[in-house]
Amino acid sequence: MLNLPKKDKKNMQVIGIDPGMINTGWAVIEEDGPKIKFIGSGICRAGDKKDMAARLVSILEQLRSVIQRFEVASGAIEKAFVKNDPLAALKLGQARASAMIALGESKIEVSEYAPNYVKKIFTGKGHATKEEVEKMASLQFPKVFFSQSDEADALAIAVCHMHTLKLNANLNRAIKKAM
């Protein structure tokens, strides 16, 4: 069961990470009462010409830098899935590990969500396309421009995580009240 992380700060910040071996998207949001406030987003570019170890280190170092810039209390990444290419899934798993290490080093709780769950929470459709995720991101945050779909995906992961944390906190309060 997830709990809201304890933080001295009034408004909790969460980071969503969309891992990839070439581009890893990230987005930081903050609860603002009943609303969600966009804080920042970007892409960690590992490049496609470096060897595997160099790419993983690049992802790790860039995410460390991002995490240090914000007051992140909790993080979420997308679960890996195997579609048709098991080797691609393995590589994605390695990129996910770099993201988890960056969060873990900073003592940030990491949650994982299936891609269809993220899409369902964010767009209302579990099989939403990348374009539909980007459109929903622009509707929810009209003043934010994303240079790549990886940023919008990371935002969707962060929003999904924030909603899940709030839902679990409300359920825990209701259970305690009922006992």
Task: Give the positions of each predicted feature.
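Phosphate- and other anionic-substrate recognition elements at nucleic-acid/protein interfaces
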Residues: 1-179
